[in-house]
């Protein structure tokens, strides 16, 4: 079983709230840079007042003091979970963990799902990269620094679950139905596969938001996330 997080990848808060009115069973939402920049912290408060848990996906990567301050601010506005880049370094991660104080789950971003091996190698200035090993390396750093979990693609879930044990939260974007296009994410899978491999949270956006019937699409994904015997 896993939690389903709806990515509110919409241009305006009003659009997101209209969509949420159609999904009364939803428990988790993801707020990313677009909505946060346009709507601000009050939008997060609006969501929490509706009883929703907010996954603040801003992927912080800055000097330790700045990131610790951002973590404190996220905790104060009621976010339940937030992301930061594992490549920010041990000092940044450890400082963030202290600032979270146990009230905010910190999730380390490893290799973005938009990357495939050759593109990631170019991005980091290497001749070649083994993405699963890179994800594993970054996840180990995150866990050792005191973070509660990591973000990875569906392709690395089983590796991290075996390597890091049952306690680590594994948040997985790139979740699609078999009939859905992958769009700009290159490492994708179905909800059923991700749950079977040990994911704890699944992030779904466009397959629900852009569906002809978002409520029906949401229920379809919910059935797969609750499939403990997958």
List each model region and its residues.
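Conserved anion-binding
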Residues: 62, 66-149, 153-158, 163-171, ...
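Glycine-rich phosphate-binding active-site loops on the catalytic face of alpha/beta enzymes
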Residues: 77-89, 176-177, 184-217
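Structural preference for beta-strand elements that scaffold enzyme active sites
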Residues: 3-7, 28-30, 53-55, 80-81, ...
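Structural motif
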Residues: 26, 50, 77, 145, ...
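Glycine- and other small-residue-rich loops at beta-strand/loop junctions that grip anionic moieties
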Residues: 8-9, 32-36, 84-85, 149-150, ...
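Conserved alpha/beta-domain cores
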Residues: 8-54, 64-70, 140, 154, ...
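Conserved, mostly hydrophobic/aromatic
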Residues: 6, 29, 59, 82, ...
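C-terminal helical cap(s) of enzyme catalytic domains, especially alpha/beta-barrels
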Residues: 93-99, 195, 208-230
